[in-house]
């Protein structure tokens, strides 16, 4: 394996490790758009890093396995991810736009069907529409993995290359509109976020900045992909002969000495998400908790000094959580007692109009 391949292995796997606390945070927050974006990013990163390790020797004259069965599935997942990643980021912007235009907090899981359809169903439909234009089952690129191979037609341009551009451009439009609305309604939104238990002002701005940086980087990338594919070969007119020639070409293996641009995008976005979510207070604690749990779980570190230290840290975290929970219960009990005393004091201090109470009071005069 070349040095660039070794570096990519560490780069991608560390991005997957950093995505675990983000996934935990978003599951607790029940943020469906972020979970959909994490789904596509982690799945494609895992596919890229595994396949780049399988076909890692560019100087091999022949390869023993052409990926039969595995590449039939992963190549189509990669095709779906080219639409699913910008679509799920677009649903995140739609969610923020819905929040900022409402005068009351959103209901939990509101519009989740629309988000799932746009992020999952739309990529599956586009992938199914592109299957008849496959020149062969897939191609295997060394240090990159398996990719679908399409005939370059105007049909491919319209249904495969243009949708990511439109989704990225729409995301930039909604981001700019959200920024304008937030600037105009800043005072009203501060009161709104105080009423909403699921979304605070910091969380809203964090998600907005994440979406803005994502689309500012992803939109030029989609334009570059369209221009690059257009320069490499001309787009042919669509005809039935191309459909009849489906899978007529054999599976091709391309030896290369570099990792393609597509393989770097998903792990880089995971690093970007980790950077933004690391500004939250509990992110570092969650990362440390996951790492300590991993050291305790691994058999070759469980009985070592490092494993015992990790177990000590986990026990300390559990004791702190139980102490904080006890203090919370004590504070709630104290508040309830104060409310009861306040009600009793108000009843005794406010005179009543009941004549029986006046008669009882006259006995002691």
Curated annotation (Swiss-Prot):
Name the source organism: Schizosaccharomyces pombe (strain 972 / ATCC 24843) (Fission yeast)
Question: How does this protein lie in the membrane?
Answer: Multi-pass membrane protein
Q: Where in the cell is it found?
A: Membrane
This protein's UniProt keywords:
G-protein coupled receptor, Membrane, Pheromone response, Receptor, Transducer, Transmembrane, Transmembrane helix
Q: Name one Pfam family in it.
A: STE3
Record function comment: Receptor for the peptide pheromone M-factor, a mating factor of S.pombe. Pheromone signaling is essential for initiation of meiosis in S.pombe; M-factor signaling alone may be sufficient.
List the CDD domains hit by this protein, alphabetically.
7tmD_STE3
Single GO BP term: positive regulation of meiotic cell cycle
Q: Which residues cross the membrane?
A: 7-24, 31-54, 73-100, 116-133, 155-182, 204-226, 265-283
Per the record, the similarity remark reads: Belongs to the G-protein coupled receptor 4 family.
A GO CC term assigned to this protein in UniProt:
nucleus
What is the protein named? Pheromone M-factor receptor
Q: What induces it?
A: By at least 3 types of regulation: the mating-type of the cell, nutritional conditions and pheromone signaling.
- Cite the GO molecular-function annotations of the record: mating-type factor pheromone receptor activity
């Amino acid at each position: 394996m070349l040095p660039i391949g070794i570096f990519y292995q560490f780069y991608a796997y560390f991005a997957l490790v950093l995505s675990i606390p983000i996934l935990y945070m978003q599951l607790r927050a029940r943020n469906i758009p972020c979970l959909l974006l994490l789904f596509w990013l982690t799945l494609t990163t895992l596919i890229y890093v595994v396949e780049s390790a399988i076909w890692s020797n560019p100087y091999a004259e022949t390869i023993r396995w052409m990926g039969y069965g595995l590449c039939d599935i992963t190549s189509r997942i990669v095709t779906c991810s080219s639409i699913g990643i910008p679509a799920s980021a677009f649903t995140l912007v739609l969610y923020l736009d819905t929040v900022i235009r409402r005068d009351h907090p959103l209901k939990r899981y509101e519009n989740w069907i629309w988000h799932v359809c746009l992020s999952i169903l739309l990529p599956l439909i586009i992938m199914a529409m592109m299957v008849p234009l496959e020149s062969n089952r897939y191609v295997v690129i060394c240090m990159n993995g398996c990719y679908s191979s399409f005939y370059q037609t105007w049909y491919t341009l319209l249904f495969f290359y243009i949708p990511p551009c439109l989704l990225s451009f729409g995301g930039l439009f909604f981001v700019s509109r959200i920024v304008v609305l937030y600037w105009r309604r800043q005072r009203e939104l501060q009161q709104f976020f105080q009423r909403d238990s699921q979304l605070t002002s910091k969380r809203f701005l964090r998600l907005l900045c994440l979406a803005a940086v994502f689309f500012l980087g992803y939109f030029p990338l989609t334009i570059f992909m369209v221009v690059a594919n257009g320069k490499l070969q001309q787009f042919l007119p669509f005809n039935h002969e191309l459909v009849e020639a489906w899978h007529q070409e054999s599976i091709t293996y391309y030896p290369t000495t570099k990792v393609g641009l597509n393989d770097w995008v998903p792990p880089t976005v995971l690093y970007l998400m980790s950077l933004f979510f690391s500004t939250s207070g509990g992110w570092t604690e969650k990362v440390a908790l996951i790492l300590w749990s991993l050291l305790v779980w691994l058999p070759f570190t469980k009985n070592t000094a490092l494993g015992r230290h990790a177990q000590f840290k986990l026990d300390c975290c559990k004791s702190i959580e139980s102490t904080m929970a006890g203090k919370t219960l004590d504070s709630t009990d104290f508040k309830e007692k104060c409310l009861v005393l306040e009600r009793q004091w108000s009843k005794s201090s406010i005179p009543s109009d009941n004549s029986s109470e006046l008669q009882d009071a006259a006995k002691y005069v």
